[in-house]
Design a protein with these regions (language model features):
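N-terminal accessory segments that position/regulate proteins before the catalytic core
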Residues: 1-465, 476, 480-525
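Short surface loop/edge beta-strand patches of beta-sandwich-type extracellular domains
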Residues: 473
Length: 525
């Protein structure tokens, strides 16, 4: 399949992504976490704090504190069991799903990502580690100082000697491919973005400075971690420091090669276990991952800054009231947050609550390597949505104008039936949801600037925005459920974004919900 066709089908013709006889092999499902065998282990305390209060920003964290960071970002936090009724009324059977949950959402709770860290803390040997979420511990992969190696892999744009840690967020292709087949590629970028978003939130609470690096020499980074690019590849690199992680200009006259750089450190050959006995091939994912890689630093670019929203979208303007100043404990919000489905409960939403939700979501910005600037910039994404039963806002479709903090109406009326009918997987009753929001981005997925790598970067940025939205919604006593099971063509037509070369990337119903009936238990001391 041509890669452009593959990306098109991911959004607009998803049926063509799956073989006609595709059935997930549930019995041979891989583990939702990676396990290494025969390597040194460094246990982390399970006695994590129940609140995340600000810490001293001028002190390097201890190993205990860093373990808290990892647990709140991606640790196993909850065990849950839910009952499902299957079959007919005459012969119904009850099955139970038992899941290990984390504080971030993931498509099918499959969690395709893994975390690796290059640590320089007093309590542990300097080197590269894997975060073993199953046992909340670090697995020692490679010893040594790799500041120079990593700096060159990132284009010599950062002083990593000031960073006590560099986090690597990877994607293991097979962890959700066994269920979603080629559609898993879309999920992998979004899931990675959600993990990045959570890591930024936790780092902020713990007084760490961050910068998200989307541009790096893939093969040299994968080589350092001992990853096979056929199975797993790093999607983002996040330096952590107690100082600002400043970015220098790219040295255009100097080209650094991943192949040459990789020769500086020996190859790792560690044994891992993932439970699956049958190996499933995914040629399209391998091909697009290969096409997305940067071999030399000459491929690094500074793209143009965010384009302001075109005010021609919508003629009727609803100025939103001043948002409430909200301050919440991230730890308690993380514990409360989940993705309602049949639990949504229709209720009237105040205009102030909508104002706060949108303002808080888009006021978030972060340091990244896409622009030649030291400032913090948001994403090139916008928020559209259908509104029903919102105080002071007529029912209809709207776009959020960030520059004026206002809603521009696109069409009038109760659009709940339209939204419900556009679901390809109707697992949410949208008649009970007052806000159905869509993150909208460029239809070319940044390909002009970044090639095929631009697609996964756009998906990651959408995931970061979604995580911020979900946390804010929970702090406002509402729930949100990220969905990809919707018809993008219908949503794009409703909002009229086709003419702007935009498309809906992900759908998030948001609203009040009733408590869910389930058995769950916390996995911390």
């Amino acid at each position: 399949m041509e890669l452009d066709t593959f990306l098109y089908n991911l959004h607009f013709d998803t049926d063509k992504l799956l073989p006609p006889d595709w059935q997930p092999d549930w019995e041979d499902a891989p583990l939702p976490y990676k396990l290494y065998r025969g390597l040194p282990e460094i246990p982390l305390t399970a006695d994590v704090p129940l609140t995340l209060k600000g810490r001293e920003a001028n002190s390097i964290p201890s190993l205990e504190e860093f373990g808290h960071y990892l647990w709140y970002v991606y640790g196993l936090t909850r065990y849950s069991q839910a009952a499902f009724i299957e079959g007919t009324e005459e012969k119904a059977t009850v099955s139970y799903a038992q899941l290990f949950r984390r504080f971030v959402p993931s498509g099918g709770a499959l969690y395709p990502n893994e975390l690796y860290v290059y640590l320089k803390l007093e309590d542990v040997p300097e080197g590269v580690y894997h975060y073993d979420v199953a046992h909340h511990r670090l697995i020692f992969l490679r010893e040594g100082n790799y500041d120079s190696y990593l700096s060159r892999s990132l284009g010599n744009r950062y002083n990593l000697s000031d960073c006590f840690c560099t986090v690597f967020v990877s994607t293991v292709f097979g962890k959700n491919f066994y269920k979603y087949n080629n559609f898993s590629y879309r999920l992998q970028g979004l899931d990675t973005g959600v993990v990045i978003g959570q890591s930024l939130e936790v780092a902020d609470r713990m007084g760490f400075s961050t910068r998200v690096c989307y541009q790096f020499l893939d093969r040299s980074i994968n080589h350092l971690l001992g990853l096979s690019e056929q199975d797993e590849s790093v999607y983002a690199v996040i330096p952590l420091s107690i100082y600002n992680v400043d970015q220098f200009n790219i040295e255009k006259n100097i080209s650094i090669s991943a192949t040459e750089l990789s020769r500086e450190v020996p190859m790792l050959k560690h044994v891992t276990y993932n439970r699956s006995k049958r190996v499933i091939d995914y040629p399209e994912l391998k091909e697009i991952n290969k096409a997305s890689m940067f071999e030399t630093t000459h491929s690094f670019v500074n793209i143009k800054q965010d384009i302001p929203l075109n005010n021609a979208l919508g003629t009727e303007l609803t100025i939103l009231p001043f948002p409430e100043v909200i301050s919440y404990d991230l730890a308690s919000v993380c514990r409360e947050r989940h993705s309602p489905d049949i639990d949504f409960m229709l209720g009237k939403i105040s205009q102030t609550k909508v104002s706060t939700l949108l303002h808080e979501t888009f006021s978030f910005s972060y340091q990244k390597d896409l622009y030649n600037t030291q400032g913090k910039l948001g994403t090139g994404l916008n928020m559209y949505g259908t509104f029903y039963n919102v105080e002071g806002v007529q029912d209809g479709a709207y776009v959020y104008d960030k520059s004026t903090h206002a809603l521009r109406r696109i069409s009038k009326g109760d659009l709940r039936e339209y939204m419900q009918n556009s679901l390809t997987v109707p697992n949410v009753n949208l008649f009970q949801v007052p806000l159905v929001l869509h993150v909208v981005g460029d239809k070319d997925h940044l390909k002009k600037e970044l090639g095929y790598r631009g697609y996964r970067i756009q998906q990651m940025e959408a995931g970061i925005l979604v995580q911020r939205l979900l946390l804010t919604a929970c702090a406002l006593e509402m729930g949100g459920h990220p969905l990809l099971g919707f018809d993008s063509n219908q949503s794009d037509e409703l909002y009229g974004v086709n003419s702007k070369e935009k498309t809906c990337l992900i759908q998030i119903p948001v609203g009040p919900y009733r408590p869910r009936v389930w058995l769950k238990g916390s996995l911390n001391s």
